[in-house]
Amino acid sequence: MAREFSLENTRNIGIMAHIDAGKTTATERILYYTGRIHKIGETHEGASQMDWMEQEQERGITITSAATTAQWKGHRVNIIDTPGHVDFTVEVERSLRVLDGAVAVLDAQSGVEPQTETVWRQATTYGVPRIVFVNKMDKIGADFLYSVGTIHDRLQANAHPIQLPIGAEDEFNGIIDLVEECAYMYGNDLGTDIQRVEIPEEHKELAEEYRGKLIEAVAELDEEMMMKYLEGEEITVEELKAGIRKATTSVEFFPVICGSAFKNKGVQILLDAVIDYLPSPLDVPAIKGIVPDTDEEVERKSSDEEPFAALAFKIMTDPYVGKLTFFRVYSGVLNSGSYVKNSTKGKRERVGRILQMHANSREEISTVYAGDIAAAVGLKDTTTGDTLCDEKSLVILESMEFPEPVISVAIEPKSKADQDKMGTALSKLSEEDPTFRAHTDQETGQTIIAGMGELHLDIIVDRMRREFKVEANVGAPQVAYRETFRAAAKVEGKFARQSGGRGQFGHVWIEFEPNEEGKGFEFENKIVGGVVPREYIPAVGAGLEDALKNGVLAGYPVVDIKAALVDGSYHDVDSSEMAFKIAASMALKAAVSKCNPVILEPMMKVEVVIPEEYMGDIMGDVTSRRGRVEGMEARGNAQVVRAMVPLSEMFGYATSLRSNTQGRGTFSXVFDHYEEVPKSVSEEIIKKNKGE
């Protein structure tokens, strides 16, 4: 089958936002206008096309980024709907990794919210060009220019409107197109009666002012346009569009548009903007990878002629076809039934069938081309972040980094029958989601599950019940504390045992010192003159790594320290790898008294939105939870409190906020960094862990 859409006419985009900004509704409308859906599903009725997992329909939030393909004006638009809730940032990371562009949806009343900041940061990390869609212009308190201001203030982004709204709230009935210098008026809320008209007289002055600002902003990034602009020459619509496209695809400029997806206003213009300004796979830099074994860096260009290379970005278990592996093709062509190499794992895989997904229905296709997003059935060993490539031309594309879980709970099956099913369920769920971990605690024998937040784990337990029919009891949440050293010291570890026959002997001197935050554990060998033979040095490193898993103060993993092996001694007969491993762990224990060990706790960036009258109560509550208030501002008729609060103090906060504000307050929390716990809290943690 020949390629249906050229690479120039392909767009791979994500739709990203804060929870409740109306992202799923926007995606729905896109699918409706591109002819993929015949009846629109409203999120608040629980019938949205993209939100196809049962929990999503109940909670009205998007959890799994469903990948959908749609067509608009001769272009193929592959859309990945990403979740807006902070506990699912890994889903966002995964989808951003394989996109060429994104639409950031904002709520016109709130502007940029905390989760928008998180997702925006992730998109910047991956260099993803973005358009901003200010949605919910029909909502009470909607303010387009305020929202644009928040993009500058909170994201420090070079964003400029390419449209202006006509009216707001229930008066929102049209959109001014600053590029084409025209207006679109809406005769109803169904999106069926749209008229292109001249800009109404009363809006001309504002439109001229903002068109001038737009041209100036684009000209600053384009020398040729700057020359024309300075010489007072007319800049044509085509030149302006080309300038915006160039600046947007190079991630130097972010066009801002407006609308109300719910009221069917502005969605078609949003689709036009996606095609006009977001990049095709040809506009983004070629993906880099390394050749296994040689570590030589290579590029794979977006072309059907290049060898096949793709990245698996999501695994899902489908009730009908089993395991689905979603992948993005960067180069080459893949036919169903063929063999590929999973170069990350070094395994050969057979691609059984290839499916093009539409929310939760699917269409079987025989071939995928460079730039496509599809799902494969039949891959056995492939997990998220793995590279699939041509067996004759191996490459490993850069993988994705996933954050460590910050919260864990003990979980136990309710019956013997549940026990057997629980193992299967947990292994399938952790295969799908790299930030979800399950393990058995060696000491207590309990099964522990860990994730990115309370909601994340709630949904995992919920899915176990629905999809795998496992009933389980869940314990109280536990925080993932860490330990580290604050001082440097040189310590000795000596293991000598003589008990008939061959003895055991290992002796090391290790210099420990604090490392930069986030750098993890670094081991260096500084031995000179062979006082510790080369073959035992890896054992010293391995011994330290093992010992670091259970810290010296309260048994939590030790992070961000450097260790240098500087001296030691050995015995010709009695020394062994095991003896040096033990000596290294003894050195770590000896470091306790000298290296000033401390406990670190995860800190959450919290934003609470409340009516003015509850301000005092909420500030007091944040302080009582050891929180630091970092800023306050008015947003419409509500107050926003931004604070940094320890995760351990956030359990049950939703209930407390509800009762403190009669259900009128909302909050969101996202993991930010680790911080040293105060001495009194540290003593409590140590006591508790020693069972005192």
Curated annotation (Swiss-Prot):
Residues annotated to bind GTP: 17-24, 81-85, 135-138
Domain of life (superkingdom): Bacteria
UniProt cross-references to InterPro entries, sorted A to Z: EFG_II, EFG_III, EFG_III/V, EFG_IV, EFG_V, EFG_V-like, EFTu-like_2, G_TR_CS
Keyword Nucleotide-binding: yes
Segments crossing the lipid bilayer: none
Job description of the protein: Catalyzes the GTP-dependent ribosomal translocation step during translation elongation. During this step, the ribosome changes from the pre-translocational (PRE) to the post-translocational (POST) state as the newly formed A-site-bound peptidyl-tRNA and P-site-bound deacylated tRNA move to the P and E sites, respectively. Catalyzes the coordinated movement of the two tRNA molecules, the mRNA and conformational changes in the ribosome.
Protein name: Elongation factor G
Protein species of origin: Bacillus cereus (strain AH820)
